[in-house]
Amino acid sequence: MIEDKVVDLDITDIELGTVASLVWQVEAEEITAFAELSGDRNPLHVDGEYARSAGYQSEVAHGMLLGAKFSGLFGMKLPGKRCLLLEQTLAYPNPVYAGDQIALKVEVRDVHSELGIVELKVTAEKLSDFDDPGPQVARGKVICKILS
């Protein structure tokens, strides 16, 4: 869960290698709510029988549901309040299901102070029963404008 307190970082406060993370327990209700909100009611996301017939364990969470969780990290933790998302590129190498515990991580890869631009690396992995990293479920890059 993302805390309600928003971080307020100026471009000069953001350093290479800075990391923000969260652990998220995926709930079936979130998948259903996202299907309604987005209008993406593809049976792969909302029909367990169909998803299983297609070779999946159950309904697959929308990739952009993970993207929305990353958005919460950007807007609340790193870079925080002054973040204006300009570009987001994500790949989803493995499926996510209700009940999965996902570790999302954002890392500062580059800071262009003169332009007010920050590049972030994003990753998400399933956690095992022992909180060990498992398969990667999302990876990508984000470019944010840091407002003054």
Task: Name these PLM-found stretches.
Residues 1-83:
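Hot-dog-fold acyl-thioester-processing enzymes
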Residues 1-19, 96-148:
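HotDog/MaoC-like acyl-thioester-processing domains
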Residues 76-100, 104:
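Mid-chain, well-packed structural core segment of small domains
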